[in-house]
Amino acid sequence: MKKILTLLLCLSVMLTACGGSVPGSEKLNVKSEEIQFAQPQPGDTVAEINTDAGVIKVLLFPEIAPKAVNNFIMLAQNGYYNGITFHRAIEDMLIQSGSFDGTAAGGKSIWELEFEDEFSDQLHHYNGALSMANHGRDTNGSQFFFVTSKIGGLSDETLARMTDASWREEVIDAYKQAGGLPSLDWRYTVFGQIYDGLSVAYDISRVKTDENDKPQKDVVIQSISVYTVE
């Protein structure tokens, strides 16, 4: 996960200084056909993450990232995440959790081994994305993070570079509206998207932290429930 921080710092100059707060609604106001901005439908799998800062509701994508979703669900159902803190909070970037010892080093998958990445052009690091943390290629365990960068905070230069690199027009447009961290695409596995409670994630990202970006006051995951929408 240290690679995330280095990459973000390198690209921070490409982010505009405008914005930084979440609109009054807890949902992104994005007009897009990209699946991450759809509301849950019957048959979809969702997770409710209860924290002492509020509830974050996430739409999961088991068809696209089956191992990441299955790992997350099984760990949640086994109570693994109960009582675990958000051990990293970086304003306008991300919040991270999933380490049993409250550090960036702890954690393991349901298989007790690291598992491979599941990249897809259907899922991207828009604001509100839920993604697996790792320390290199195919090193996924139990840690995850939410993207909480500036809403609509991508510079024209960044968007132009994405166009030059032949990113899909729909993805570029979604990033333009929602903001996010496109530099993390194809490096970390996205497997979910916040559809309610985005402001809770942003509140966590703005807490006071120490020199290691660890919140000075613990922000705790109380429980995670997973269910199928009826």
Give the positions of each predicted feature:
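Cyclophilin-like peptidyl-prolyl cis-trans isomerases
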Residues: 18-230
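Sec-dependent N-terminal signal peptides of Gram-positive bacterial secreted proteins and lipoproteins
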Residues: 2-21
